[in-house]
Amino acid sequence: MNNIFYLSNISSFSNNTVLESIISECNNLTLKEGLVGHEDKSAEIRKSQIGFFEDKNIPLNKLMYDIATEVNEEHFGFDINNTQNIQYSVYKESDLGKYDWHIDTNFLNNNFIQRKLSIVLQLSDPADYEGGQLELDVNDYGVDWGDFQQYANQKGSLIVFPSFIRHRVTPVTKGIRHCIQEFIIGDTFV
């Protein structure tokens, strides 16, 4: 693994027309309370509304998978072969929306597939909310996340990181934060 994360502002995503089109599609999704590991113990750890794009054949899925594949080849070298459905997340001030420290993979499951890469696409302008900061726990890897904090939370920013990296979204104290996540999967880590 050459890097701990990949961070970019994809030109097509930073175009407001493209982002507004994605947000419009997200607004048609049915939202439900986000869970932690398919269990209803989320109030302490997670407070967000989520919806899923059930059709994996949408252009956004292909675009994000293509980006992840390229980033994986250049930086991580994981065995990846598919995606899970794109997840749309909403963190609201009225809920103190957050997702406390967690990882996106489960090393203890009995499945033959595992989340390998996590992708977050920021849909909100940082002026539209306070708090709600995406933070990666990368200090043990010799990286100061503070150097990347502001950039990672810009509208249109896209970050790809190994699903085993601890991360969180801090509580939203004003406004609403919107983002998309996609998980790239592959055979279990050996």
Residue ranges of each PLM-predicted region?
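Catalytic core of non-heme Fe(II) oxygenases with the double-stranded beta-helix
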Residues: 73-190
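Non-heme Fe(II)/2-oxoglutarate
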Residues: 1-87, 96-98
